[in-house]
Design a protein with these regions (language model features):
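Glycine-rich, proline-tolerant flexible connector loops at the mouths of alpha/beta enzymes
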Residues: 181-208
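Short, glycine/acidic-enriched capping/hinge loops at junctions between secondary-structure elements
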Residues: 15-18, 44, 171-175, 201-204
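N-terminal amphipathic alpha-helix/helix-capping segment at the start of soluble metabolic enzymes
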Residues: 131, 139-178
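Short coil/turn connectors at secondary-structure junctions
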Residues: 2, 155-158, 184-188
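Hydrophobic faces of well-ordered beta-strands that scaffold small-molecule active sites
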Residues: 5, 33, 160-166, 188-192
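Short amphipathic alpha-helices and their capping/turn segments at secondary-structure boundaries
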Residues: 18-27, 170-185
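Nucleotidyltransferase catalytic core that binds NTPs
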Residues: 1-144
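Active-site beta-loop-alpha junctions enriched in small/polar residues
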Residues: 10, 36-38, 122, 163-170, ...
Length: 208
């Protein structure tokens, strides 16, 4: 019977790094992809462009993927305890930084269930976040913004919106990130009105 290999991923923007780690995982057994749900992602990163079902449709059709299951929590513990894989594969980029605590959790759980953690060298010069920044720079339509807002409200208990009446507050909303207990907190969007815009310029609302 083939060994079970667990690999967690967001799977929104597929690039060579994803394919590389899937192929490496397949060397150890049947690859089970734990695909993060919107709910799992929302409190840590910006929502993916694609819904979970769309991402699942893409990932399950990639060579060497045996199964795709939802990962409803940023922590790997629930799925690892449920599936009890023989191996879990992860890039070595989590040895430091905000995901270091996840690594410690995974090592503890895999030790308890008799599994092994295999760390693969992180693919350099290409990341999903870097590609996402390039896509964001192209801009979005009002329909895309509305769709994202609806998904955010459904996925998060609190949606963080910053009032933005000038370029400075816009930059604050776009770039502010704070690490709290292993979670990355940032603004989900920005909002502006003619009233705040006109007030900042010392003009009545009708002239803004």
């Amino acid at each position: 019977m083939a060994k079970k290999v667990y690999l967690g991923m967001i799977g929104d923007i597929m690039h060579p790094g994803y394919i590389n780690i899937i192929n490496k995982a397949a060397e150890y057994g049947d690859v089970i992809i734990g695909l993060f749900t919107d709910k799992a992602i929302a409190n840590h990163r910006r929502l993916p462009y694609l819904t979970w079902e769309q991402r699942k449709n893409v990932v399950e059709n990639i060579k060497n993927v045996a199964q795709v299951v939802p990962q409803d929590d940023w922590s790997y513990i629930p799925n690892l305890m449920k599936l009890k894989p023989d191996y879990i594969i992860h890039g070595d980029d989590w040895k430091c930084g905000p995901e270091k605590y996840l690594r410690e959790e995974v090592f503890n759980v895999m030790s308890k269930i008799g599994g092994e953690v295999i760390e693969i060298p992180y693919t350099k010069n290409i990341t999903a976040s870097g590609i996402q920044q390039e896509i964001d720079a192209l801009g979005v339509t009002p329909q895309m913004r509305l769709s994202s807002l609806r998904r955010l409200i459904a996925a998060k208990p609190v949606v963080r919106i910053l009032e933005s009446h000038n370029g400075l507050t816009g930059l604050i909303a776009e770039h502010t990130k704070v690490e709290v207990n292993g979670q990355t907190r940032e603004f989900d969007g920005m909002w502006a009105s003619s009233l705040t815009d006109s007030t900042s310029k010392g003009q009545p609302d009708i002239e803004a």
